[in-house]
Amino acid sequence: QVFETELLEGEDVVGMVFKNAQRTLSETLEAIDRKAIKESATLIAKARSVFLMGLGGSNTLAQDAYHKFIRTGINCQYAADFHMQLMLASQATKDDVALIVSHTGEGYDTLALAEELRNNGAKLLILTSNARSPLAKLGDYVLSVSPCCSKIVAESFSARITSLVLFDVLYVEILELMENTGVENLNKMRDVIAKRRI
């Protein structure tokens, strides 16, 4: 759903979109469970493997988390295709953690991933705008993103921005937990990328 109503004539589109994003960030910050963030980061830092999963638009968010977390040296697993994600989930163990991203938390395929991971003993971190969803109920920790109340921009648009910020928060928390090891791994990544620049 892109538009819920027609854009009012003369409305400041730039201001409206930015204000919606700012409101979503502010509301999420006020409601955020800081303990859940820290404990989620600890699980990720100690995991054998971290599976980063999401479908549709949520898959691009999962890929962003993958792009961030591999900088720390953590063993991360990511796939764009649902069947590939399901295959990864089938290999999960009790020593693994999965971060599943879903705006609604109600998709059949996303639930199938969560159930397979849970059946294999993996810890589940759920990032969603719907903390009462079937997916959220399967999670060990739920990181809630405040849904935007815009009448024009779909909720998931603003939720995406907040999700990216929450990944940044987790990334920094993980680096702090890893101390020197995390910094060393980050520097290795920076060095190898720098060699490819003119």
What label would you give each PLM region?
Residues Q1-K35:
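HTH-adjacent hinge/linker in prokaryotic transcriptional regulators
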Residues I32-K35, F51, I193-R196:
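Short secondary-structure junctions and interdomain/linker hinges
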